[in-house]
Amino acid sequence: MGNLVIGSRGSELALWQANHIKERLKKECLIESEIQIVKTKGDKILDTPLNKIGGKGLFTKELEELLLKGAIDLAVHSLKDVPVVFEKGLDLACITKRADVRDTFLSVKFPDLMSLPKGAKVGTTSLRRSMQIKLKRQDLDTESLRGNVQTRLKKLECGEFDAIILAEAGLCRLEIQGAKYRKAFSVEEMIPSMGQGALGVEMLKNHKHFATLQKLNDEKSAFCCRLEREFIKGLNGGCQIPIGVHASLMGDRVKIQAVLGLPNGKEVITKEKQGDKTKAFDLVQELLEEFLQSGAKEILEKAQLF
């Protein structure tokens, strides 16, 4: 039998992630594999903000189509990019141990967000980040920043932006120091995206190695990420809308923090729930109900106009 084929986007970070799974497959599952690079819609359209391109699965759809055809055996994703509803026959075979979940501030001239001058230009791909930046500093100018990690850093160094916000996990995986000033926000300062820091391996549910890949699953990370995905699912959300949600375990207790609002930092709802781990999914439903009662659906409809 030939090697398993891993589908991956072509960026340096995506290939790091695919190679990480390839190495673990060999070491922990005794399975040989090879990587096939796939360009997704999100990779091809680089001159438009992600939320303007439209549709879910901007970084996953082409990979899912190849999975369904049997052209690749598994697809490695940043879990935050994976839609919460799967194409029929597909599912996550595993969720890996989470890396650092935080978002990170980078700048050549300024040590942190609060030291930026009025009107400073902050680059981010994410409406979620833009919303939380504007909530703290309404006077800042948040602008779309596309491209891979290195491209974004180059734009910062060339002076196109006064600061940019990137995921700490990506910087750590690529061993990038970044700019002169680098400061991670706490989860309380900026609630991450669902699944941020984790990798999701997607396969056909009837693939003969689907169960085998459970060996790569991290139970604690998977539990927390599934709670976050359940919250997003309840709001009909995706990764291109201004919602942050983070679940964490502290012994037998779970804490779920969430934020939702307009990208301009207006009409923001922030709530959290804590309780027994055994009641975790009930807590998600309670949190959802509170958000819906506070007008979450209406706010998300308005957010589509940005």
From Swiss-Prot:
Tetrapolymerization of the monopyrrole PBG into the hydroxymethylbilane pre-uroporphyrinogen in several discrete steps. Binds 1 dipyrromethane group covalently. HAMAP family: Porphobil_deam (MF_00260). Pathway: Porphyrin-containing compound metabolism; protoporphyrin-IX biosynthesis; coproporphyrinogen-III from 5-aminolevulinate: step 2/4. It catalyses: 4 porphobilinogen + H2O = hydroxymethylbilane + 4 NH4(+). Keywords: Porphyrin biosynthesis, Transferase. The modification S-(dipyrrolylmethanemethyl)cysteine is found at residue 239. The keyword Transferase applies. One of its GO terms (cellular component) is cytoplasm. GO terms for molecular function: hydroxymethylbilane synthase activity. The porphobilinogen subunits are added to the dipyrromethane group. Belongs to the HMBS family. This is Porphobilinogen deaminase. Its EC number is 2.5.1.61. Coiled coil: none annotated. GO terms for biological process: heme biosynthetic process; protoporphyrinogen IX biosynthetic process. It comes from the Bacteria. Its cofactor is dipyrromethane. InterPro entries: HemC, Porphobilin_deaminase_cofac_BS, Porphobilin_deaminase_N, Porphobilinogen_deaminase_C, Porphobilinogen_deaminase_C_sf. Monomer.
